[in-house]
């Protein structure tokens, strides 16, 4: 991919390290507006990168992240030199977000996109009770739990992994359905679903056992039902250095201990 320095927009999180990197790189390579850019370089952590991907989704712009945050699993290593060459050699990965359609106890309908996961969790000390349907067929009549989520391959190494869900290769046509602290059924540990599946969560006893939902950082309180599917139209493009590709990161993560 050929990328001139004058077609790069630099954006950063609010941390001191990220702002310093923004100032340094803008002075060195120039600064293009996001609207006119071919590539957006995101400086920060994984959370800021997800925000940048959401902001540029559907525009055709490519996002290249450099780590000025903490973990930076989705980020490339920060180096100020040779940036245009690194971007030109980068491997592009297409990410399809999830679409969440949530209905609240007041009858409000809220839709949002999630690159990582759509998660539901109990709002109070009461255990959540949730019915799970896949493609209009009830698969779990009642899940008693702290929460449950649907994760994309891109999000499988985040909240999903911390809840003991599976790590998915980015090109796997799968979604991870993962419970959080399940109580009953005791032996149910989740499922792998086709990325073409539509999943519906119905909250049982919503007044007694209120549940919140979130598509990444978009939170909806007191939901009665949540429907999730992979978006058929929205896409985002993430760039990785070829020697540190997404598949290599996923493989390495599975051997960490």
UniProtKB/Swiss-Prot annotation:
Domain of life, per UniProt, equals: Bacteria
Q: Residue span of the signal peptide, if any?
A: none
Its needed co-factors are: a divalent metal cation
What Gene Ontology terms for biological process does this UniProt record contain?
A: NAD metabolic process; NADP biosynthetic process
Q: What class of enzyme is it?
A: transferase
Q: What is its EC number?
A: 2.7.1.23
| Matching InterPro entries | ATP-NAD_kinase_N, ATP-NAD_kinase_PpnK-typ_C, NAD/diacylglycerol_kinase_sf, NADK
Provide the active-site residues from the annotation: 46 (proton acceptor)
Task: Tell me any Pfam family this protein matches.
Answer: NAD_kinase_C
Q: Name one GO cellular component term.
A: cytoplasm
Q: Which reaction does it catalyse?
A: NAD(+) + ATP = ADP + NADP(+) + H(+)
**Which molecular function terms from Gene Ontology are attached?**
ATP binding; metal ion binding; NAD binding; NAD+ kinase activity
Q: Which UniProt keywords apply?
A: ATP-binding, Cytoplasm, Kinase, NAD, NADP, Nucleotide-binding, Transferase
Q: Does the keyword Cytoplasm apply?
A: yes
Q: Where in the cell is it found?
A: Cytoplasm
Q: Which SUPFAM superfamilies match?
A: NAD kinase/diacylglycerol kinase-like
- Which residues are listed for NAD(+) binding in this entry? 46-47, 116-117, 146, 154, 157-162
Role description: Involved in the regulation of the intracellular balance of NAD and NADP, and is a key enzyme in the biosynthesis of NADP. Catalyzes specifically the phosphorylation on 2'-hydroxyl of the adenosine moiety of NAD to yield NADP.
**HAMAP family associated with the record:** NAD_kinase
Matching entries from NCBIfam families are given as: PRK04761.1
- Name the family: Belongs to the NAD kinase family.
Q: Which protein, by its recorded name, is this? A: NAD kinase
